Amino acid sequence: MSAPNPLLAEINKGADLKHTETQDKSAPKIGSDVHIKKNDHASLLSEVEQGAKLKHAETDDKSAPKINENTTIKPNNHSALLGEIKAKAADS
């Protein structure tokens, strides 16, 4: 059996800790003059279910893209391009 490691012996011995006093401040600070009323959820829910009267709003929808009337879409020449590529590949 090998000699005991001094580092492990020191760890097993432990450390002497000083005593400390803690101040627990986790409790809520509510003054004695503060009184919490009962919350009436039923009346709140009925008020929400009734809804609100909304006024009509005029809108000016500008979300459509502005495309000039003279703008045209060019024809798609993809199939002609592929045919040209196939013809050049066959010639090679």
UniProtKB/Swiss-Prot annotation:
SMART domains: WH2 (SM00246). Residues 68-79 have a biased composition (Polar residues). InterPro entries: Actobindin, WH2_dom. Induction: Down-regulated by phagocytic stimuli. The keyword Repeat applies. CDD domains: WH2_Actobindin. Residues 1-33, 54-92 are annotated as: Disordered. Residues 3-20, 40-57 form the WH2 domain. Keywords: Actin-binding, Repeat. Signal peptide: none annotated. Residues 13-33, 54-64 have a biased composition (Basic and acidic residues). GO terms for molecular function: actin binding. Transmembrane segments: none annotated. Pfam families: WH2. Is able to bind two actin monomers at high concentrations of G-actin. Inhibits actin polymerization by sequestering G-actin and stabilizing actin dimers. Monomer. This is Actobindin-A. It comes from Dictyostelium discoideum.
